[in-house]
Amino acid sequence: QTALGLPAPRASWQPAAFGENLSGLGLTEAQACIGDVYRLGAALVQISQPRSPCFKLNQRFGYSHLSQVMQLTGRCGWLLRVLEEGRVDPVDALLLMDRPYPELTVKRTADILFNQARHEGDLQLLLEKPALSPNWRQHAAHWLEHGVVADWRRRLLGPAEFQLPPKA
């Protein structure tokens, strides 16, 4: 939280605190790419999309706009699809097996939909990547077709009854 300029949180920032099933050290959104295939223990997994932060993070940590800060900074994490099931142990290393789209980092993907002005070439790039989740490709197609980005406010801030007042 210090790097983001936030005061001490309501809950501890530790592995699984953000609702993730897997946590690791060292690999960032600026390094990991959509479509990356990793061997993790006996499992084979693939990065399918950036994580879309939601208002539940605001509630858990006591910051009214933590989800927005995460989205704006691109520090959201990512989702993995399982290509091959297998046992995974806490000591297993994440081994990169394939990187089909080195030009499409998780951060760049998130920035295209969340943080930059509409750019047809970038939206088309998302549509052309079958490893990107169908949901994210749908968002890109909608923005490309209708010229309007999705309204993220409900996801980021939640229903009115869940919104926290800003911290002073």
For every predicted segment, state its role:
Residues 1-168:
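Metal-cofactor-dependent catalytic cores
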